[in-house]
Amino acid sequence: MAKKKEFRQAEVNIGMVGHVDHGKTTLTKALTGIWTDTHSEELRRGITIKIGFADAEIRKCPHCGKYSTSPVCPYCGHETEFERRVSFIDAPGHEALMTTMLAGASLMDGAVLVIAANEGVMPQTREHLMALQIVGNRNIVIALNKIELVDREKVMERYQEIKEFVKGTVAENAPIIPISALHGANVDVLLAAIEEFIPTPKRDPNKPPKMLVLRSFDVNKPGTPPEKLVGGVIGGSIVQGKLRVGDEIEIRPGVPYEEHGRIKYEPITTEITSLQAGGRFVEEAYPGGLVGVGTKLDPFLTKGDLMAGNVVGKPGQLPPVWDELTLEVHLLERVVGTEEELRVEPIKRREVLLLNVGTARTMGLVTGLGKDTVELKLQIPVCAEVGDRVAISRQVGSRWRLIGYGFIRE
C-alpha cells in the first residue's frame, strides 16, 4: 500500500489544446481522473466552453521505469515515486471560443497539442498552434489521439502529415506520441514526454506577487442568512511571487463606475481570507495550477466571472493600467482558423480589433498607424507591463480570427 504523501501544489501549468472533439477532455480525464466539462451547457453540448483545470501527480515506477499518475504502478504493481504535481488546463477547441483559449494560453508553461488520428490537422489545430506561437510557448508535446479508430498505415501517414504541419513553428521539434485516451494506451509514454519536454519554469518566489484572474464567483447559496455570507472568490493562476492568507491585495484595473456618462475603472483593495490550490485550503500559494482566493469583497462584484481579466498583487506593486496602447505589431501572412486561405490585410485606421492581454480581452479602436506600430483606444482598460505580448484578432465573417501579435511599447 502506498504511503500517504503530504499535499503539494501543482508547479507547472500544461495546456490541452487542439481542434474541437479531438479528445482533449477525455485525455485530461485519462491523466487526472477528472472530467473537466462540468458546466451544465458543456455536458449538454459535449464541448468545453469554460477553461477547466485538473491536477495530477506524475509518478515513476522504480521497478519497471514507466510513468503513471497512480501511487501503485498499473504495469507491474510496485509502489511508484513522486516526480511532480502538474495542472492540466483544458482549453476549448471550438472556433467560437478562441478568445477563451487565448486567455488560457497566457497561463500555460507548456502544452499538449491533441490531434485525432481519424481527422488529422484541422482549422482549430492550426489556430491553437498559432496561439501557442503568439504567446511564445515552446514547450510542446503532440498527442496523436484516437489511434483505435484507424489502422497502422493511417497512423504513419498522420505522423508524416503532422511533421510537415509543424515545420518552421514552435512545435517543430515536439515529440509526436500515438495514444488512445479512451483506452489509456501509451499514456505512460506521453507522461515520459511531458517530463522531458515540459520542464517546470525557474521562478523567483521573492518577486512581487502577480496573479492573472480567469474567473470569479459568488459562492453563497440563495437564501443564505446575512451573518453567514462569505466574500467574493477570485480564481486564476499566480505567474510570479506568492500569496498568503491575510495579505492585503490590490485588483487592477478593478471595478467599473460611471462618471459624466463615461465608464471608468477604479482599482480595489481587499484582504485574502482563504486560499485554495488543487482543491485544498492552503496558507500560502505559488505559481502553478488554479488558485482560488477568498476575499472580503462584496460577492456582487465577483459573481459570474465579472473579475476575469484583472490582475492581483500587493498594493502599489502592480503594472500600470492602460486606456490606450501603442503596440509594435507583427502580422501573420494568413488568417488562422478559416477553411479557405485568406491573406491578412494591413490594419486600418478606425478599425476595431480584439486584443488579448494575459487573461484580459478588450476591444481596441485604431487611432494611429506607424511603420510597425499601431495606436489603439481601449474599450476596457488593461493592467500590463511594457513589453507584454498582446494577441490581435480581427472580425472575419461572423468570427474573431487571429491575425497577429504585438508588444506593448511606452
Swiss-Prot record:
Keyword Nucleotide-binding in annotation: yes
UniProt-recorded name of the protein: Translation initiation factor 2 subunit gamma
Positions annotated to bind GTP: 21-26, 145-148, 180-182
CDD domains hit by this protein: eIF2_gamma, eIF2_gamma_II, eIF2_gamma_III
Region G2: start-end pairs: 46-50
Catalytic EC class: hydrolase
GO biological process: formation of translation preinitiation complex
Amino-acid positions noted as binding Mg(2+) 1 in the UniProt annotation, renumbered to this chain: 25, 48
GO molecular function terms attached to this record: GTP binding; GTPase activity; metal ion binding; translation elongation factor activity; translation initiation factor activity; tRNA binding
Function, as annotated: eIF-2 functions in the early steps of protein synthesis by forming a ternary complex with GTP and initiator tRNA.
Binding of Mg(2+) 2, residues: 21, 46
This enzyme's EC code(s): 3.6.5.3
Cofactor(s) listed in the protein's UniProt record: Mg(2+)
Region named G5: 180-182
Region (G4): 145-148
Domain of life of the native organism: Archaea
Lineage: Archaea, Methanobacteriati, Methanobacteriota, Thermococci, Thermococcales
Reactions catalysed: GTP + H2O = GDP + phosphate + H(+)
Family statement drawn from the similarity comment of this UniProt entry: Belongs to the TRAFAC class translation factor GTPase superfamily. Classic translation factor GTPase family. EIF2G subfamily.
InterPro entries listed in its UniProt record: EFTu-like_2, eIF2G, eIF2g_C, eIF2g_dom_2, eIF2g_GTP-bd, P-loop_NTPase, Small_GTP-bd, T_Tr_GTP-bd_dom
Keyword Transferase recorded: no
G1: region residues: 18-25
Region annotated G3, chain positions: 90-93
Binding site for Zn(2+): 61, 64, 73, 76
Pfam families, sorted: eIF2_C, GTP_EFTU, GTP_EFTU_D2
Keywords: GTP-binding, Hydrolase, Initiation factor, Magnesium, Metal-binding, Nucleotide-binding, Protein biosynthesis, Zinc
Gene that encodes the chain: eif2g
Subunit (UniProt): Heterotrimer composed of an alpha, a beta and a gamma chain.
